């Protein structure tokens, strides 16, 4: 009888361990960790964009070009064609899913341009020695994971209203092209700041222990 009990108990343990292994084969990542990773990635990309913009300005742009560019629209930022929240109050009025969709759309609008820009710069510029495209893809995946978590597996990004940054001259031998790329880098920096802000707002709203000084 004891032998039978031991055999049955042993079989039960094996089955329980098997079930635990099956359930834990693909463990879910806590929502806090998903937000923390996304915020960290967005912060890095925004810092990279700001450093690249500053280095490019210092290397290629004259004082006259810099001042004239600030007062003109050499390159129209794609994000200006969509009513993204641009201030603190408007951002807080949007739901987490809306902010995630905005963020995903912004990230996806830059996947092609950064590949073209990456081929232009020499290694003394931040872009030339970075893996910005890969980091954008990682952030895209992180945002999609958050959307899946909040939407129970179904999500759709906003359709592009027009092809973003499809046609721009990256021949740096031309002064006009230099200024256009300068404008693009300015747009990239602004858009990555938006993404970072949106993610921080979402994390702040959901987790009390997060830094909420936004």
Curated annotation (Swiss-Prot):
Position of the signal peptide: 1-25
Localization per Swiss-Prot or TrEMBL: Secreted
Keywords: Disulfide bond, Hormone, Secreted, Signal
Coiled coil regions in record: none
Molecular function as annotated in GO: growth factor activity; growth hormone receptor binding; hormone activity
One GO process term, biological-process aspect: animal organ development
Cystine crosslinks: 77-187, 204-212
Any one GO CC term of the record: extracellular space
Entry's family note: Belongs to the somatotropin/prolactin family.
Protein name per UniProt: Somatotropin-A
Organism expressing this protein natively: Xenopus laevis
Gene: gh-a
């Amino acid at each position: 009888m004891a032998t039978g009990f031991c055999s049955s108990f042993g079989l039960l343990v094996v089955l329980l361990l098997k079930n635990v292994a099956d359930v834990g084969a693909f463990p879910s990542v806590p929502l806090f960790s998903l937000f923390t990773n996304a915020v960290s990635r967005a912060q890095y990309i925004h810092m990279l964009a700001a450093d690249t913009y500053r280095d490019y300005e210092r290397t290629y742009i004259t004082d006259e070009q810099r001042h004239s560019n600030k007062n003109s629209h050499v390159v129209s930022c794609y994000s200006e064609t969509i009513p993204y929240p641009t201030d603190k109050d408007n951002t807080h009025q949007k739901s987490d899913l809306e902010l995630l969709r905005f963020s995903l759309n912004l990230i996806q609008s830059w996947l092609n341009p950064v590949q073209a820009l990456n081929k232009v710069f020499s290694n003394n510029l931040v872009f030339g020695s970075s893996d910005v495209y890969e980091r954008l893809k990682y952030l895209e995946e992180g945002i999609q994971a958050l959307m899946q978590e909040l939407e129970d597996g179904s999500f759709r990004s906003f359709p592009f209203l027009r092809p973003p940054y499809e046609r721009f001259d990256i021949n740096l031998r031309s002064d006009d092209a230099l200024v256009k790329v300068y404008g693009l880098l300015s747009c990239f920096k602004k858009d990555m700041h938006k993404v970072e802000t949106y993610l921080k707002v979402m994390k702040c709203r959901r987790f009390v222990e997060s830094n909420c000084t936004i």
